[in-house]
A protein has these predicted regions:
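Ankyrin repeat arrays, specifically the small/polar loop and inter-repeat linker segments at the C-terminal end
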Residues: 1-8, 30-44, 66-76, 98-112, ...
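Conserved ankyrin/ankyrin-like repeat signature
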Residues: 21-22, 57-58, 89-90, 125-126
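Ankyrin-repeat and related helical/solenoid repeat scaffolds used for protein-protein interactions
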Residues: 85, 111-130, 135, 142-143
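Cullin-RING E3 adaptor/co-adaptor recruitment helices
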Residues: 146-195
Length: 195
């Protein structure tokens, strides 16, 4: 039986779906046959997908057997997707590992991708944790073209009051005379000063 058929597809899918025992068994067979599975193929793709799928136990095992995995590959993709899909434990673990390695993850990669998408997707615990790491995230702010990115405007469509209140609480420019602050408050019928 060729366990490496189709570029080690069996191993990759076992990892990606969180089947740790299956992945360990396949890896052991490859060792016994003298053909080690290439865990770092395609710029550590398996590790990145495992983290994005929330399989902390598999990610920890992969890092244990291959300590030089680039956990920051593809501009912090493992971290960003863990935040995107609400896998807080995975994101926190990756952040801790990066600190231990002396190269802390850039939590602001891809224009605050992890924070923006955790807010948009309603992952309040992830957003709060990210904000605690970098307390001066500007979530309501003009860009150089005079336009704005506003997680609040996006999340108001979901009718998630807790998330909206939190974003307004940490915003850098929540002043009563700020149109970006007043407009969403007016639309959502929130009284300014009572958020």
């Amino acid at each position: 039986m060729d366990i490496s058929a189709q570029n080690e597809e069996a191993f990759h899918w076992a990892c990606n779906l969180g089947h740790l025992e299956m992945a360990q068994w396949l890896f052991q067979i490859s060792k016994e046959r003298g053909h080690y599975i290439n865990i770092s193929a395609i710029n550590d793709w398996v590790f990145r997908v495992v983290c994005g799928n929330g399989h902390l136990h598999v990610a920890q095992w992969l890092l244990q057997i291959k300590p030089d995995i680039n956990i920051s590959a593809q501009n912090e993709q493992a971290f960003r997707t863990a935040c995107f899909y609400d896998y807080l434990a995975v994101a926190q673990w990756l952040f801790q590992v990066s600190k231990e390695r002396g190269k802390t993850i850039n939590i602001s990669a891809e224009d605050e991708y992890a924070f923006r998408w955790s807010c948009i997707n309603g992952h309040l615990a992830v957003a709060q944790w990210l904000q605690s790491l970098k307390p001066y995230l500007y979530v309501i702010n003009y860009d150089e073209n005079g336009e704005y990115q506003n997680c609040y405007i996006r999340c108001k469509k979901e009718a998630n009051w807790e998330k909206r209140k939190y974003l307004l609480y940490i915003a850098s420019d929540c002043k009563e005379d700020n149109l970006l602050y007043r407009l969403p408050c007016d639309v959502a019928k929130i009284m300014i000063g009572y958020v």
